[in-house]
Amino acid sequence: SKKKVVVALGHKALGATLPQQQDAVKGAAKAIADLVEADCQVIISHSNAPQVGMIHTAMNEFGKQHPDYTFAPISVCSAMSQGYIGYDLQNAIREELLNRGINRPVATILTQVVVNPYDDSFYKPVKVIGRIMTKEEADKMVAERGYNVIEDAGRGYRRVVASPRPQSIIEIQSIRDMVEAGLVVVACGGGGIPVYKTEG
């Protein structure tokens, strides 16, 4: 059977802005295309913390202009980030493969992971997202929206969210089927969107 390779791209590998990301994925695409040329089955995962923070901030700023607008939860911001990072990766990898004469499909799967609803991180969130706020802004976010915030190395305050440990991947069979069918798959961006099981 073919060798399976998981490529994990950290946030520094994706850049801090959209133009930086579009440039950065070209370098990643060359390395990934090398693996495909070596006849490996390739699955790509990636960080999304800066991107989720950017989307979250944009949605918050929009909400300030339009107070009736419902704020997007972190799960939705995470899904948005998986979508646009996957979009850039797909395009860069596909272009690199075609340049090498390889006609291999590339696809992104929006991925959810089952977590324990009592995971410690829900009670002690530590994953920072969004922009740096003043104490006044942070206090307002805590009072109005119930955000958890921490002081960030003396620079100001940041929102913190839970980053629970994944127990299983909901779309795992889809990922397996696509990899076995020969696709290059982008999945589990940001570790996946956390969800938990309920009764019924």
Name these PLM-found stretches.
Residues 62-185:
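Ligand-binding beta-strand-loop-alpha-helix segment within the catalytic cores
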Residues 10, 46-48, 111-113, 189:
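Active-site-proximal beta-strand/loop segments in catalytic clefts of secreted hydrolases
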Residues 13-15, 169, 184-200:
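Conserved mixed alpha/beta catalytic, RNA-binding, or beta-rich assembly cores of soluble enzyme
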Residues 1-45, 54-64, 73, 177-182:
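N-terminal glycine-/serine-/threonine-rich phosphate-binding loop
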Residues 13-15, 49-53, 115-118, 193-195:
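Short, active-site-adjacent cap segments at secondary-structure transitions
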Residues 12-20, 155-162, 196-200:
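Short, basic, glycine/proline-bearing loop/turn elements
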